[in-house]
Regions:
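Hinge-like oligomerization/junction regions that interrupt long coiled-coil arms in large cytoskeletal
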Residues: 2-195
Length: 200
């Protein structure tokens, strides 16, 4: 499968896993967690570098892959063993606040086995409409959790702000959301073409 946009180290592990030399590797987080186009930039921002973390079954699988990377000078990867990772949820419930879109973990889809991964990476991040809403929510809750806007600006836990411009559609999730959207459009157009041909 195409791994454009991924780090060389991630590609190296996936290639070894693909040929059966490394077992228990499920793939990068950004391939296992799906976001619809409207939320893709916010979720990408919330994930940050974790989008390229590799999910595996157990510690042993991660250790084997790390040994491979070390021996081949293949770079570094963060592994998320399903046996270890436990999801955490936000205790606060800012759902009634102006501009609240949702908890990031609730705005993505994934297979049930990846629930703890999604919760651990996104369960304590709020998605808000814009920066004004994000700062208001963060301030009201004492900057206890991170708030990310739909256009990828961030109010970090603790109160620091991160933002600026980002290239729309450049991230791994945005790219996949766009591909899925185009594939659906292509399917619709193919069906319409067939229908037109049949009635002609």
């Amino acid at each position: 499968r195409n791994l454009d946009g991924f780090a060389q180290s991630v590609k190296a592990v996936m290639k070894e896993a693909g040929r059966g030399a490394l077992r228990g590797i499920h793939g990068p987080v950004s391939r296992l967690i799906h976001a619809q186009a409207d939320y893709a930039l916010a979720i990408e921002t919330a994930l940050g570098a974790a989008a390229q973390n590799l999910v595996c079954d157990r510690d042993e699988d991660a250790k084997r892959a790390i040994r491979f990377l070390k021996e081949t000078h293949g770079g570094r990867v963060t592994f998320l063993p399903l046996s270890n990772i436990r999801g955490t949820r936000l205790r606060e419930q800012p759902s009634g606040e102006a501009g609240f879109v949702g908890i990031a973990a609730d705005l993505v889809t994934y297979e049930p086995q990846y629930a703890d991964i999604a919760e651990s990476l996104l369960g304590r991040t709020v998605i808000a409409e814009d920066m004004d809403d994000a700062t208001a929510i963060a301030r009201k809750y004492g900057y206890k959790f991170r708030v990310v806007t739909l256009d990828g600006q961030v109010v970090n836990a603790g109160g620091s702000l991160t933002g600026g411009s980002s290239i729309k559609g450049a991230g791994l999730l945005s790219r996949r959301a766009e591909i899925e959207k185009l594939q659906a459009e292509a399917k619709t157009l193919t069906a319409k073409a067939k229908e037109a041909t049949d009635t002609y």
